[in-house]
Amino acid sequence: LINEQDPDVVCFQEFRRSVRGAYDAIEYTAERTGYPHYMFQGRDKHKHGLAFMSKYPVVDTDTLFVYPHYINQGILSILETPAGRVGVGNIHLSSFQFDEITSRKDLEPKEKLPLYLKRIRNVIPRQEAEVERIVPMLKKYDMPLVLATDMNAMPHTKMYNRMAGQFRDTFKEKGRGLGWTFHLLGFLKVRLDYEFVNDHVEVLTHNVIESNHSDHAAILGHYKFPGSQKQATLDPPNSE
């Protein structure tokens, strides 16, 4: 998929970094797809975390939030591009991890419902706190920003409204259809993944690309920055 679409930047919100001897999954992926600049941020080298690949050099990074015991985190990478410096956010808000409940064979469906509701009550406050932390941090940057985000939250939630109130949802400008990116509980189609931009960015396209490489669809966006004649593309699929 990456070779087919050939984006300038790729953001993975959930990447399994396997390191065995000389083999490193992110290094291998970057080399096979032609990205000279890449990074992984996770709890340890064998676990899930954020991964990032770019055709442009990374000159600085800013950690938006991170947990010692969760894979969810956010990081802003500052790239040196032909249009000047551009910030690319790779953000993964706290997960509900419903699969842990869905996969339990010892429970009837009616017994699972209270567990789902309890999980929702526990996770939403954490998501709200994450958004409240990252918005003022991102607003400090007076440069083009593109934010690849797995929010684990649907449109019209408090978390989405907070982000959409400060940044532009590219789906609303150039998306088509309903923009579904995830099958919740295996059957309910929802939009959990977004690309947001600030007012320094012109949105050219927003496309949702389904594939069998992940349980989330990828989003491919094309953007133009002030002073640049070249379009930049961003593709943030989740990956395991």
Region locations from a protein language model:
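Metal-dependent phosphoester-hydrolase catalytic domains
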Residues: 63, 78, 128, 133-146, ...
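Catalytic-adjacent loop/helix segments of enzymes that bind and process anionic phosphate/sulfate esters
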Residues: 60-137, 230-239
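Structured beta-strand-rich core segments of catalytic domains in phosphoester-bond hydrolases
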Residues: 9-101, 207-210
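N-terminal, active-site-proximal structural segment of metallo-dependent hydrolase catalytic domains
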Residues: 1-28, 226-240
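Catalytic domains that recognize anionic headgroups
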Residues: 4-12, 16-18, 109, 115, ...
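A broad, low-specificity signal for short, low-complexity segments enriched in glycine/proline
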Residues: 13-16, 37-40, 47-52, 105-110, ...
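Glycine-rich, phosphate-binding/catalytic loops in enzymes
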Residues: 26-30, 69, 105-107, 162-166, ...
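Sec-exported extracytoplasmic/periplasmic mature domains
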Residues: 3-7, 31-34, 58, 139-140, ...
